Each structure stands twice: as structure tokens, then as C-alpha cells.
């Protein structure tokens, strides 16, 4: 709402709207901006100027928090607006949401990538001992867990590490040593953030990237958990380790979009509009 350059008259742009389902990215744009009162006032004034008393926000936890702030600010200034939050996050980490649009396609990408990288890894197993595939996900391991979807028999992944289960580095190294001795190579999938059994983060000193305006670490711009583990495995076990970090490819590769995810996104949009028409007052 802060940038009106993306406004579309749906009555005149049906072909454009239909093409969006197969287009990477978000036409409406995205933001990591920390919302302040000035932003809330700007949004409210733009809504009033447009004669609008309704707002649909699409996104994850940050978006939902901003929408809650918007409702409170409008009410405090004497305006009754209707606000709906439509879930959309590849991390699938919204409380109360079973599956958010975006997650299915990210899961499909990761499962396909792990399957195909594993085949390449096996071809190079004469000089690569360990492959570490780092996924997006922030504080949740849904994307990493999806790496098993195309697993067959003893194929990758051999080990999956998610933030929901704290990692004991000593035990992990012993498991890697054991699996390598047994099969000659180990394929590990790790979430971009992992909790350590000692109460900290795995490779915390390697998470040296910047933070966004909300104070959250931008893991994809740091040296990363995967690289930390690769270095650790090499230095302590003497096993040559490679770290793969596809990062934003997981949410941008249009050829990996899952059809159920596409359908879910459309249904979520329709449900948001339907819910908006059924709301009666501020805060609903």
C-alpha cells in the first residue's frame, strides 16, 4: 500500500492476472521493513483517499503483525476498517496454518534438487565424502523435512537436521563417521538455523551476516550453518565436505511450482476476499 505503482484494474487486465500464476516473484512486491506509526498513517490516509475501508495483507509472521498494528492504529484514530491476513510463506511457519501457499513448491524444489544432487554426488564420490544441502526455513524445519519426499532406499538424504531438534555436535560427528565408514559417502540436509544441545546455535560465530529492520538475522547472507558444518567435518574427521546453498532458488524456480500449491494459492485468495465481505467491523 505504501507503493501504488503496482495498482491493477482487474476489469482491464485479465490476461495479466491470469499470467501471474506462472510468474516467479510477487507483483505486489515484498518488504522486510519495520513498520512504524508513520507507515501506518500513510497506509490509512491512502485508503481513505481511495475510498477504501478494507485491506488484505499477504505474507507471513511479519505481515500478520503489521496487519494487527494497522487495525489498532485505525481504531485509535476513529476509523473502522476491515483487515484480512492471507497466509503465504515458503517456511510454513504461521501458527494455526496447516499448509501455507508457497511451501508446497519449495518442498517440491528441495526434494527434486536433493534427489538429483545425490546422483551427481554418487558420481563424484571418489573425491567428495560429504555433501551438505542447506535449506531455507529460519526457525522451522518443514522445507528440510521435505527433502525425503523422493527418497528411495538408501539414497539421499542420509541425515536431516532441523531446528526443532537440538543437535549434539559430538554425536553428529560420530554418526557421520559411522555412516561414511559403512557407505563411503554421506548426504546431509540442514535447515539454515539449527539449535545446539548446549543452548546456543550451531555455528553461531559463522552467522555473521546482517540483520533486517526487525532485528532478525539474514541467514542467507551469512557464512552459514552448512559451511560451518562442512568446515567442522573436514577439520575433525578429515572428510572432504561440500556445502550447497540454493537459497532463494527454492522459492523462485517456476518450473518447480506444484499444481496443488498453485490451486491452494488461488483458493486462499478467494477465501480472503470472501472473509472480507463477511467482516463487520474493526479487528475482524
Regions found by a protein language model. Name each.
Residues 2-53, 62-63, 101, 108, ...:
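Glycine-rich oxoanion-binding loops at beta->alpha junctions
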Residues 95-107, 256-259:
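Short beta-strand elements at the ligand-binding edges of bilobed clamshell
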Amino acid at each position: 500500500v505504501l507503493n501504488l505503482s503496482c495498482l491493477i484494474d482487474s476489469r482491464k487486465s485479465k490476461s495479466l492476472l491470469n499470467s501471474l500464476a506462472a510468474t516467479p516473484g510477487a507483483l505486489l512486491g515484498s518488504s522486510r521493513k519495520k513498520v512504524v506509526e508513520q507507515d501506518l498513517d500513510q497506509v490509512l490516509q491512502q485508503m481513505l483517499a481511495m475510498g477504501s475501508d478494507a485491506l488484505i495483507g499477504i505474507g507471513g509472521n511479519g505481515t500478520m503483525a503489521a496487519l494487527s498494528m494497522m487495525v489498532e492504529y485505525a481504531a485509535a484514530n476513529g476509523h473502522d476498517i476491515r483487515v484480512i491476513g492471507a497466509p503465504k510463506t515458503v517456511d510454513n511457519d504461521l501458527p494455526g496454518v496447516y499448509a501455507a501457499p508457497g511451501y508446497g513448491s519449495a518442498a517440491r524444489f528441495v526434494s527434486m534438487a536433493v534427489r538429483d544432487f545425490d546422483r551427481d554426488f554418487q558420481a563424484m564420490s571418489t573425491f567428495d565424502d560429504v555433501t551438505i544441502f542447506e535449506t531455507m526455513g529460519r526457525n522451522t524445519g518443514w522445507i528440510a523435512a521435505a527433502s525425503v519426499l523422493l527418497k528411495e532406499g538408501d539414497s539421499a538424504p542420509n541425515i536431516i537436521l532441523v531446528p526443532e531438534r537440538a543437535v549434539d555436535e559430538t554425536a553428529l560427528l560420530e554418526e557421520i563417521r559411522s555412516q561414511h565408514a559403512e557407505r563411503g559417502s554421506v548426504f546431509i540436509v540442514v535447515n539454515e538455523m539449527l539449535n545446539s544441545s548446549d543452548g546456543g546455535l550451531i555455528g553461531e560465530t559463522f552467522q555473521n551476516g546482517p540483520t533486517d529492520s526487525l532485528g532478525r538475522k539474514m541467514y542467507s547472507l551469512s557464512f552459514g550453518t552448512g559451511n560451518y558444518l562442512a568446515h567442522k567435518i573436514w577439520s575433525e574427521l578429515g572428510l572432504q565436505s561440500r556445502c550447497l546453498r540454493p537459497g532463494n532458488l527454492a522459492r523462485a524456480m517456476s518450473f518447480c511450482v506444484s499444481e496443488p500449491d498453485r490451486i491452494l494459492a488461488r483458493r486462499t485468495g478467494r477465501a480472503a476476499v470472501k472473509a472480507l465481505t463477511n467482516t463487520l467491523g474493526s479487528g475482524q
